[in-house]
Amino acid sequence: MKDLFNAIAATSGQNTYRRPDSSSVIYPEKHAIDIDTLLAKQSIEYPAGTYMMNMITNHDLNSWEGTEFERLGNLTRAMAVLTYTLPGMPLIYTGQETGLNRALEFFEKDMPPTWTPRNDYFEFYQKLNHLKHTHPALRAGSSGADMKRYPTASDDIYVFSRKDDGGATIYVFANLGKSDAEVKYTGEAPAKDITAVNFFTGRTDEFPTTLSPGEYHIYVSR
């Protein structure tokens, strides 16, 4: 997942990381729609019920390929949302929950991040952790709900839902591209008569019809 996210962000013009020799990392062109290909590949290569590890950063990435902000830019939060809502288990690396924007020393002891005062990154990840722990559709492995995709005309728009056996459903919307895009469905679309609460605002909203670059939403419906 992390390698695909890096490539999607680079395609969107978000990757600003430069190696110590000032050269940039070359990534293949990828878009949000390529997440489908990765998930299909994982379903073939790994046994059913496997806990896939989803992440936007880790110790190797942070030290040798740049922080998530250098690699993912304004897509950082949208991609973090996907690590929590796609099938699998999210990984948080040291300092990610505080928005730490520097490389940690790899072979030497480094200073830990400062957790106080709490900032909006702490609140952001606290909310996602709560959702992951409490929403039955987001359980990892075979206990979690299957994912239902809603294809759109834009390769950069990613929309899906996960519904548990009791009917509790989450809907996720994200624009991983470089431009504003219309959420125009090319197949089945989420039902329009659904009463859904925007997870981050707590308001009952209609699903978005356009998304700006890096924009993301989670809706919860019962």
Language-model segments: residues:
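Short hydrophobic/aromatic beta-strand or adjacent loop that forms the aromatic wall/cage
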Residues: 155-157, 168, 213-218
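Asparagine-centered strand-capping/turn motif at beta-strand->loop junctions
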Residues: 173-177
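Solvent-exposed beta-hairpin/edge-strand motifs
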Residues: 187-202
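Beta-sheet entry/capping signal
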Residues: 51-53, 89-92, 168-171
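Active-site clefts of carbohydrate-active enzymes
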Residues: 47-71
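C-terminal beta-strand-rich structural cap/linker in extracellular carbohydrate-active enzymes
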Residues: 205-222
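Conserved short secondary-structure transition element at the edge of the structured enzyme core
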Residues: 81-98
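Active-site-proximal helices and loops of the catalytic beta/alpha 8
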Residues: 1-52, 82, 99-131, 136, ...
